[in-house]
């Protein structure tokens, strides 16, 4: 089928490339000329495991192209997927200006049978509002909701082998078209859930907010473990082995970040407040996660006898999680910002997200390094802020010989306590007593 993705950011790019790989004729549009030029040269603007292989395959199969121009070629498309950003406004409400801008532009170029699919994360009721908006302008296009559930770092696998495909429609024609588009995945067993527009939109918000709640809860249980001497890793495993709960998102750490969880839980909280519902759980999760970076800094300060000013601290890991170059709302960046405000000298390293971190945060007391070993030279403490597997493989004996003070605080619980102590480090992890 002939389909287009408007917005070649993370969601649009991954979705478009894989749809091309699955056999559809795909056009990805973005208003960033530099990005489009690079993509046409097979240069990805994001890091995502295996995505470069699928990009090459789709381009060489002549099923994928990139453009920055809305044209009459759009009249040949069966569906237009809107995958632009929906950033948060000041009070947490989703800003839909990019969605409406995309809808405005495509409506002038597509045929009357083309389906407009909203894949951007939008508040419940948005698709119905878009239908009314188009009708007021004299258009009667079908509009569907199709939220994405891709995890950065494993997005290719998530798209090819999804837990479920959710679509919100208001007629059989839209459902039939989406079934055709997703046929390669449905045929291999993917669950295809059809619901109404509002429910489909709400599923995305509730899914992300529930996962954020699991993270916030286990983080607070880690604090309890520190007080009473319980083992947070064993606790997470013991709880997660219950099939009613599940093991995923029960890893204690410095809080959740990224482009989705913080934004989506704020938007859901804004939605319930607009409907006069006092959802105390959402408020508590938002507050808990907001305080988490400060709590991590407090732990670091405790290990340094309460004296942070003038200290040299290595931060290993800058992205909000491993497997991505995304530093948006990264707990590591938040922690660094707090430390810099306390006159700390920070030496930072990340295996993938270094360049994005440099664009995001600059300071006279902040130095970025091309290797973890270099970042750790002559520091008072090493902070593991992101769960990169590379950190497990570092030559920690070499690092031990380079540091000023052999102390590690592992905010992701990825290193082996006994191994670190055998080398000579004072090792502390989230959920262990300080």
UniProtKB/Swiss-Prot annotation:
It catalyses: UDP-alpha-D-glucose + 2 NAD(+) + H2O = UDP-alpha-D-glucuronate + 2 NADH + 3 H(+). Substrate binds at residues 148-152, 204, 208, 249-253, 257, 321. Its EC number is 1.1.1.22. GO terms for molecular function: NAD binding; UDP-glucose 6-dehydrogenase activity. GO terms for biological process: polysaccharide biosynthetic process; UDP-glucuronate biosynthetic process. Pathway: Nucleotide-sugar biosynthesis; UDP-alpha-D-glucuronate biosynthesis; UDP-alpha-D-glucuronate from UDP-alpha-D-glucose: step 1/1. It comes from the Bacteria. This is UDP-glucose 6-dehydrogenase. It comes from Rickettsia prowazekii (strain Madrid E). The lineage of its organism: Bacteria, Pseudomonadati, Pseudomonadota, Alphaproteobacteria, Rickettsiales.
């Amino acid at each position: 089928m002939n389909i287009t993705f408007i917005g070649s950011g993370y969601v649009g790019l991954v979705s478009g490339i894989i749809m091309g790989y699955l056999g559809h004729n795909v056009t990805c549009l973005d208003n960033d000329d530099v990005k489009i030029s690079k993509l046409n040269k097979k240069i990805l603007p994001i890091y995502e495991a295996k995505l470069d292989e699928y990009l090459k395959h789709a381009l060489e199969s002549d099923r994928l192209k990139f453009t920055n121009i809305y044209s009459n070629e759009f009249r040949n498309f069966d569906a237009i997927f809107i995958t632009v950003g929906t950033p948060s406004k000041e009070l947490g409400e989703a800003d839909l200006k990019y969605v409406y801008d995309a809808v405005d532009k495509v409506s002038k170029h597509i045929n009357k049978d083309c389906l407009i699919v909203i894949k951007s994360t939008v508040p419940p009721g948005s698709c119905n509002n878009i239908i009314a908006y188009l009708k007021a302008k004299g258009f009667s296009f079908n509009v569907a909701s199709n939220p994405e559930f891709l995890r950065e770092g494993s997005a290719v696998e998530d798209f090819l082998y999804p837990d479920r495909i959710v679509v919100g429609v208001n007629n059989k024609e839209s459902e039939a078209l989406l079934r055709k588009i997703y046929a390669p995945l449905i045929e291999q067993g993917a669950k295809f859930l059809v619901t109404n527009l509002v429910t489909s939109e709400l599923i995305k918000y509730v899914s992300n907010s529930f996962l954020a709640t699991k993270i916030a809860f286990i983080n607070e249980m880690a604090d309890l473990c520190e007080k009473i001497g319980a083992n947070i890793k064993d606790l997470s495993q013991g709880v997660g082995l219950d099939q009613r709960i599940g093991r995923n998102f029960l890893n204690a750490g410095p809080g959740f970040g990224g482009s989705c969880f913080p934004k989506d839980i704020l938007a859901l909280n804004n939605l319930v407040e607009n409907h006069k519902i006092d959802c105390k759980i959402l408020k508590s999760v938002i507050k808990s996660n907001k305080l988490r970076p400060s709590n991590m800094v407090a732990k670091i300060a405790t290990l340094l006898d309460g004296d942070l000013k003038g200290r040299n601290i290595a931060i290993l890991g800058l992205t909000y999680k491993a497997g991505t170059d995304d530093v948006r709302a990264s707990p590591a960046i938040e922690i660094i910002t707090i430390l810099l405000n306390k006159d700390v000298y920070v030496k930072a390293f990340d295996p993938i997200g270094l360049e994005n971190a440099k664009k995001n945060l600059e300071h006279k007391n902040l130095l970025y390094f091309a290797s973890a070993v270099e970042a750790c030279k002559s520091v008072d403490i090493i902070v593991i802020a992101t769960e990169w597997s590379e950190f497990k493989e570092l030559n920690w004996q070499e690092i031990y010989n380079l540091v000023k003070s052999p102390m590690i605080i592992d905010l992701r619980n990825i290193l082996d306590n006994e191994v670190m102590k055998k080398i000579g480090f004072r090792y502390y992890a989230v959920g262990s007593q300080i």
